[in-house]
Amino acid sequence: MRSALLTILLLVAALAVRAAEPAEEVQRMAVRLMGKSLADYIEFRQIEADGDVFELHSDKNKIIISGNSANSMAMGLGHYLRYCCHVNVSWDADEKIAMPKSLPPVDKPLRRRALVEHRFFLNYCTFGYTMVWWQWREWERFIDWMALNGINLPLAITGQESVWYRVWTRLGLTDEEVRSYFTGPAHLPWHRMINLDRWQGPLPMAWLEHQEMLQKNIVERERELGMRPVLPAFAGHVPEALKRLFPEARISRMSSWGGFKDDYRSFFLDPMDSLFARIQTMFMEEQTMLYGTDHVYGIDPFNEVDPPSWEPDFLAEAARTIYSTLTDNDPQALWVQMTWLFYIDQAHWTQPRIKAFLGAVPRGRLLLLDYFAENTEVWRKTDSYYGQPFVWCYLGNFGGNTMLAGNMAETGQRIASALADGGCSISGIGSTLEAMDCNPLMYEYVLDNAWSESLSLKAWVDSWADRRVGKAIGQNREAWQLLVDSVYTRSAALGQAPLTNARPSLKGHGNWTTNPAYHYNNKVLYDAWRKMTQAAQTNKRVTNSMAFDLVNVGRQYLSNHFIVLRDSLTAAYNRRDIEAAAAVGLKMETLLSQLDSLLTVHPYFSLQRWVDKASSFGTDAADSIYYRRNAKTL
């Protein structure tokens, strides 16, 4: 039975979400991004429409942006900035926005309708590899970026440890037991996915309090801009110490993960145990009281770990029970789950097991994220997830890797094919990136595909090139077309990283996480870099976006060339040519020095920025040392 408290909380949350005026919220965003003097020339109007729609037109000296919601109007503003103003708005708060002195008119009226209901963004891992040390300044820019790109279903899992702290202490665990159960901040994504406990814990109480405050700001702003934050819910992960209080509870140890010792393995409560429903109710009460709800919950049991049983009946009953504990507390609940587990462990997740698991939830109440669809479309292997709705997702980055990569043309073709063949099951387009990486064009391209059936790749790339420098420059367009035709023709893969990042060796690349292989001619990359440099000289000014591109393409070229030098060193060593080895070694040292100098040009590539942001969370010297160490061990 739903508690009276939770019912009241759900009603209050629903009223709070509806309180803001959409046009006013988007106007405030415009002021944040471009300043009041320019934003005053833009008027936002809310219109009635069937589905998500935005319209653009000029009226005298005003730019009129209309939409059915704050999110649609924000997407309209993003379209205007990108295609009319040649302005790039980065997700990185350190990158300044180069606005024109005056706003250009809209050449001809434009109307766009979203092709899908859901535009999803983020991944549990992003909250470790990229966002863990963010303050409100970084989050504010990023939420604006999401709105400008039409995202309306963002993962929102910050601050959940504060909720869990309340739940576990209510059940009787001590402060030390609870905070020691959590990992250090940078590893929390894998703790939340039931992979890892206790690593670099205990988690400081000041961290829990700060993240709670931050999450309140995050979900408030996301709702203001027409998004439905995907909040977490209980998936079965419990502290080992819970066995002390509930010795009869069916708590099992999960399989080992990621090479961590047994001391760090997680524990799972059988969903059919009566304690499961009790914990779910407590969690949803506490979370709704703190953060409200939009009735969308992310639950990902069995991610990269084995369930207690592989029997289809168990998997079906687990899914059925998890879902019922959601709807017992929130009748409108929509369960969102990533389907990485079906891809990464295909040997165990056979079709009968997947069908049993998915079929146990009423059709339409489980939204599946096809996690790595640019490489493997699980929806095609599962008869469109046996009727459950899904979001076609571009992954694009593993582990915060910094290789230029992405299969751009193929991605566009796959999205078009999914929209044509997915039937009533295709419900969204999005991205499950593990980190915000060095290929930002891929994500904006994917999200633009949610609003256009006939997106010309060449025209899109030209527009991208223009907004990187603020106007159309031939050399820059040519540079980006070279990159798209060579570098961006193959999807990102696990373990990609430049050889300069690997431990020194005469052959190979050491660990699987530092695979430097690339499929294109490095001379083409150099030609693109040269054309970008010429464009910068033609422009007589370097925007922040162009500085990023010059560093990004240049450091990839130098990193690729380092392989040639290393292999030359190995050849000289094998033939015992000391003089040649010394000469090549000097070239390698020079290249590494040049690479370091190049990377200092843009803060996005700075390790020091990462470490300093972590250190800033410390309330004293010991705290700062703890956070710095945690940041360096990810």
Regions found by a protein language model. Name each.
Residues 282-286, 309, 512-516, 532-536, ...:
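Active-site-adjacent structural elements in folded domains
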Residues 9-18:
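Hydrophobic h-region of N-terminal signal peptides that target proteins for export
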Residues 20-116:
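Contiguous, structured surface segment used for ligand recognition
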Residues 57-60, 123-127, 199, 545-549, ...:
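Acidic/histidine-rich, surface-exposed loop or edge segments in extracytoplasmic proteins
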Residues 543-596:
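Ordered core of a single globular domain
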Residues 1-5:
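Positively charged n-region of N-terminal signal peptides that target proteins for export
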Residues 116-135, 146:
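Active-site-adjacent substrate/metal-binding segments within catalytic domains
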Residues 88, 92-103, 122-126, 147, ...:
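Catalytic-core regions of glycoside hydrolase
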